[in-house]
């Protein structure tokens, strides 16, 4: 083949190619226009159905080791052999419901939970540190004028006045504000949120005197004083063997020496009742009357107290007069002519207290009248 024939063959082949291109061009333009017309202008939404999550490393190993297709077998042995791997594979996954229901591997879930817990702890520590710094700055700003001071009571911080300590403000970053406390020989009771007010000089001043004397309080849970069942006054009828209410009685039936008065007959050396329920104790001749027991009907020291546990007005005993017209405590002196007690058994009949019964007080100094001394 010479050079001229080769050029003719090339020309004919190029013409055939150009003719083929010209025939296919209109259809390609139509297909492109159709494709542009059907193109989505927004992405596909995320599926809220079940999603299957696999570990990539385990997936590549499992796909390389096992064939892509499993030939079914009609024999029962083949079915059992195929079921065992399925149980093993599904036991490695657990379901988790976060935003979507997910099926996830156990090791991946444990790793995610540990990372989430670590992040939460670090975030909480950061917030606590910021809150503590902010609280300290506020405290320093309030103490800058010099009229207030910062005190620490039982590990908690309070702000109070330098000269006037009538109020305590709870400012501690940690802990909970107590309902009452005793500090600097003063009792404080929670009045408002984070504010405690001085209510007296005795630790017993925070307890409700109505509740202690009667066993109940009309204000109930709304009462701002403390209702402590262990500080209820002992039932005077129970001391004289005349209370038939037993467990239904609102007052206490426990012989606790911290709330039982001393036997006046024993103090005079004239108590002959072996079943006397009053406290038999000797006091010194010049022992004063216990203010805690006389006013609140309760003394923490009990029989170890050096003062007399008698329900008598302390003001009248010390100064000879009482300025409280509503005071219901005994105001007379103890008479030396008190007759000796008889050894008659304690009566179990319900009724009013008889001064002649064993263990009872005489005249206006009866225990039942002296215990009803509450006046606020």
UniProtKB/Swiss-Prot annotation:
MF annotations from Gene Ontology: zinc ion binding
SMART domains attached to this UniProt entry: ZnF_C3H1
GO biological process: nuclear mRNA surveillance of meiosis-specific transcripts; nuclear mRNA surveillance of spliceosomal pre-mRNA splicing
Start and end residues of each stretch annotated as Disordered: 60-95, 347-376
Name by which UniProt lists this protein: Zinc finger CCCH domain-containing protein C337.12
This protein's record includes keyword Phosphoprotein: no
InterPro entries: Znf_CCCH, Znf_CCCH_sf
Coiled-coil ranges (or none): 2-25, 105-140
Top-level division of the source organism's lineage: Eukaryota
């Amino acid at each position: 083949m010479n050079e001229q024939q080769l050029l003719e063959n090339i020309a004919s082949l190029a013409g055939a190619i150009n003719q083929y291109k010209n025939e296919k061009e209109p259809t390609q333009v139509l297909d492109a226009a159709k494709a542009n017309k059907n193109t989505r202008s927004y992405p596909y939404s995320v599926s809220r159905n079940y999603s299957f999550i696999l570990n990539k490393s385990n997936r590549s190993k499992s796909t390389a080791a096992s064939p892509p297709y499993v030939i079914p077998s009609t024999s029962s042995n083949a079915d059992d052999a195929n079921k065992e791997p399925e149980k093993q594979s599904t036991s490695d996954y657990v379901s988790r419901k976060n935003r979507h229901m997910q099926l996830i591997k156990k090791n991946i879930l444990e790793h995610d939970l540990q990372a989430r817990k670590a992040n939460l702890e670090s975030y909480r520590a950061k917030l606590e540190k910021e809150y503590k710094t902010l609280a300290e700055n506020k405290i320093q700003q309030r103490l800058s004028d010099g009229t207030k001071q910062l005190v620490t009571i039982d590990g908690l911080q309070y702000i109070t006045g330098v000269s006037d300590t009538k109020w305590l403000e709870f400012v501690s970053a940690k802990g909970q504000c107590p309902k009452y406390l005793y500090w600097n020989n003063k009792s404080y009771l929670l009045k408002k949120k984070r504010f405690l007010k001085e209510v007296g000089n005795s630790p017993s001043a925070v307890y409700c005197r109505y509740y202690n004397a009667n066993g109940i309080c009309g204000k109930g849970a709304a009462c701002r004083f403390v209702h402590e069942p262990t500080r209820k006054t002992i039932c005077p009828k129970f001391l004289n063997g005349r209370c038939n209410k037993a467990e239904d009685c609102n007052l206490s039936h426990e012989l606790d020496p911290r709330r039982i008065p001393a036997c006046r007959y024993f103090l005079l050396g004239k108590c002959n009742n072996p079943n006397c329920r009053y406290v038999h104790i000797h006091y010194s001749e010049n022992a004063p009357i216990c203010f805690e027991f006389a006013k609140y009907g309760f003394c923490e020291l009990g029989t170890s107290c050096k003062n007399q546990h008698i329900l008598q007005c302390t003001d009248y005993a010390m100064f000879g007069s009482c300025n409280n017209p509503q005071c219901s405590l005994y105001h007379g002196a103890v008479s030396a002519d008190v007759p000796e007690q008889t050894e008659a058994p304690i009566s179990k009949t319900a009724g009013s207290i008889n001064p002649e019964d064993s263990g009872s007080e005489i005249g206006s100094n009866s225990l039942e009248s002296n215990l009803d001394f509450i006046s606020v």
